[in-house]
Structure formats: C-alpha cells, structure tokens
Amino acid sequence: MKNVTDSFVSLGHWPSAGSFGFNTDILATNLINLSVVLGVLIFFGKGVLSDLLDNRKQRILNTIRNSEELREGAIEQLEKARARLRKVEIEADQFRVNGYSEIEREKLNLIDSTYKTLEQLENYKNETINFEQQKASNQVRQRVFQQALQGALGTLNSCLNSELHLRTISANIGILGAMKEITD
C-alpha cells in the first residue's frame, strides 16, 4: 500500500511541461477539473439525463392525465349522485304529501265511521228504550185489564143471584124469539 501512495505522491512532482500529470494545487486546478468533469458529465450524461427527465415528464403527464380522468369520473359520479338525491327527495316529498293526505283521509274516514257507529248505537238505545216502554205499557195495560176484569167479575158475581140470572136468560130468549119472528 505504501507503493501506491508513493506513486501518487511521485505523480504530483512530475514536471508539468510536455507531459500529463496531476496538479495538486487545489486553487489552480479546481476550475479546470470542474469544467472537465462537467464537460464529461454533460457530454455523456446528456442522453441519460434527458431520458430520465423525459421519463419523469411522461410519468408526471400520465399522473396528471389519470388524475384528470379520475376527477372527471368523480364529477360524473357526483352529478349522478346529485340527480339520484334530487329524485329521491322529490319522491320523498311526494310520499310525505301522499302520506299526509292518506293519513288525513283515513282520519276523516275513522271520524265518519265513529260518528256513524255512535249514531247507530244511539238509534239502538232509543229503539231499546221504546221497546221497553211499550213492553212496560203493555204489562201495565194487562194488569189494569186483569184487575178491571177481576173487579167486574167480582161485581157480577156479587150482584148476580139466581133470580136475576133467570130473568136475564128469559129476556134473552124473548129477544131471540122476536128476532126469529121478524126474520120469518
């Protein structure tokens, strides 16, 4: 390894005129070395660098294009979703309105049905009351009639004796005999 180091040191001491060698003076050779390195890099790296930049540019353009396509797709989906939302909102409003009107209609039908049922119950109640009143009146009449009949029979039985009975029978026989003579 010492030989390698010595060879580099001896290269630095060669005379610069008429031969190739390394100048180790940093201040004197830095710009030249840099320009040589840059020239070599530009000459050989130009194609590689332009290929890298072109590839990077293509990837960026493809990414932008894909992003634009995705954005357009997202905008289309958003518009479709908004249209569906508007349609669903309209249908919901219609269902709400129809539901409210249906509820009102059912409410009115229920109220009408309840009034009719109450009216029928009132009629049944009145008919039942009238029937019970007639039944009570008939029972009272029957009792009055039975009591009057029993009173009349009691009066007749107490007033009728056999002599009155015989006179009534002979008067009736006389009336029947007179009727027979008139008809003959």
UniProtKB/Swiss-Prot annotation:
Recorded GO MF terms: proton-transporting ATP synthase activity, rotational mechanism
InterPro entries attached to this UniProt entry: ATP_synth_b/b'su_bac/chlpt (IPR002146)
Membrane topology: Single-pass membrane protein
Superkingdom per UniProt: Eukaryota
Keywords: ATP synthesis, CF(0), Chloroplast, Hydrogen ion transport, Ion transport, Membrane, Plastid, Thylakoid, Transmembrane, Transmembrane helix, Transport
Protein's cellular compartments: Plastid, Chloroplast thylakoid membrane
Family from the record: Belongs to the ATPase B chain family.
Oligomer and partners: F-type ATPases have 2 components, F(1) - the catalytic core - and F(0) - the membrane proton channel. F(1) has five subunits: alpha(3), beta(3), gamma(1), delta(1), epsilon(1). F(0) has four main subunits: a(1), b(1), b'(1) and c(10-14). The alpha and beta chains form an alternating ring which encloses part of the gamma chain. F(1) is attached to F(0) by a central stalk formed by the gamma and epsilon chains, while a peripheral stalk is formed by the delta, b and b' chains.
Main location group: plastid
Transmembrane segments: 27-49
GO cellular component, as recorded: chloroplast thylakoid membrane; proton-transporting ATP synthase complex
Function in brief: F(1)F(0) ATP synthase produces ATP from ADP in the presence of a proton or sodium gradient. F-type ATPases consist of two structural domains, F(1) containing the extramembraneous catalytic core and F(0) containing the membrane proton channel, linked together by a central stalk and a peripheral stalk. During catalysis, ATP synthesis in the catalytic domain of F(1) is coupled via a rotary mechanism of the central stalk subunits to proton translocation.
Identification of the protein by name: ATP synthase subunit b, chloroplastic
Note: In plastids the F-type ATPase is also known as CF(1)CF(0).
